[in-house]
Amino acid sequence: MEQKQNESTELRPEGARVMDAPLVTMNVNDFIRQIKDESAWEKNDRNAMAIYKTEGMRIVLIALHEDAIMEKHTANGIISLQVLEGEINFNSADQSVSVKKGEMIALHKGLPHSVAAVKESVFLLTIADFRD
């Protein structure tokens, strides 16, 4: 398997990090500090960073300021969402749940949902699309 990494950008000059390899280690606390130190965090109600990407799966670290809303949308795979800091409200067509630090949820592919930050929050979003 070929190792893949992202390229550095103007917004993330130190960005060259491994995105896919037989084994990828990630320091999530360092990534949290990084996205909260970026100008995008200061200018917007959120910031995010893909920390792993391979065929069939992606992991994204997302930080939301208090009261930030991710409007209703769908995902092209099964998702899991694990709150690392703060608290969010996760709303699907069938129910609305509060998800706090240390808790997680899972949702099937293609179901409409939205996310609202009750307070400043950080979570890991995993999107998996497996074809058996």
What are these regions (language model features)?
Residues 1-56:
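A short, N-terminal "cap"/entry segment at the start of jelly-roll beta-barrel domains
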Residues 41-45, 55-74:
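Conserved short histidine dyad/triad with adjacent acidic residue
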Residues 55, 84-85, 100-101, 119:
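A cytosolic small-molecule/anion-sensing beta-strand core signal
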Residues 58, 87-89, 96, 112, ...:
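Structural motif
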Residues 76-89, 93:
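Glycine- and acidic-residue-biased ligand/ion/polar-headgroup-sensing regions
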Residues 94-109:
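Short acidic-glycine-tyrosine-enriched beta hairpin
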Residues 109-132:
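Ligand-binding loop in jelly-roll beta-barrel domains
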